[in-house]
């Protein structure tokens, strides 16, 4: 069989697509919203998405909270804010999606703060 030589970018894109489909199917089966974390060097975002209805239920970010950057302390504030918004809408259990980022630093700080505020994932 002929070996296909993919570039790293193509491999990463294929892996991301597989993970997206896997998380989407997991959410559809569990009827739980997905907490999606997106980060850049400057800021961090968190969205609560329901794939059943294709809508965003709640969102929070370091930009929305008028924070200067997305460091660990501000990531904790975003985590607490998204947890409060999710609990206000009646969602206690969510599926955590870190968009392929490593679970450390700002991602971990946001996740821990959301757990402490009452979310389960």
Curated annotation (Swiss-Prot):
InterPro entries hit by this protein: Ribosomal_uL18_bac-type, Ribosomal_uL18_bac/euk
Entry annotated with the keyword Ribosomal protein: yes
Keyword Ribosomal protein: yes
Keywords assigned: Ribonucleoprotein, Ribosomal protein, RNA-binding, rRNA-binding
Cellular component per GO, a single term: cytosolic large ribosomal subunit
GO biological process: translation
Coiled-coil stretches: none
GO molecular function term, any single one: 5S rRNA binding
Pfam families listed in its UniProt record: Ribosomal_L18p
NCBIfam families according to UniProt: L18_bact (TIGR00060)
Role: This is one of the proteins that bind and probably mediate the attachment of the 5S RNA into the large ribosomal subunit, where it forms part of the central protuberance.
PANTHER family xref list: 39S RIBOSOMAL PROTEIN L18, MITOCHONDRIAL, LARGE RIBOSOMAL SUBUNIT PROTEIN UL18M
Subunit record text: Part of the 50S ribosomal subunit; part of the 5S rRNA/L5/L18/L25 subcomplex. Contacts the 5S and 23S rRNAs.
Family per record: Belongs to the universal ribosomal protein uL18 family.
Listed name of the protein: Large ribosomal subunit protein uL18
Source organism of the structure: Ureaplasma parvum serovar 3 (strain ATCC 700970)
Taxon lineage: Bacteria, Bacillati, Mycoplasmatota, Mycoplasmoidales, Mycoplasmoidaceae
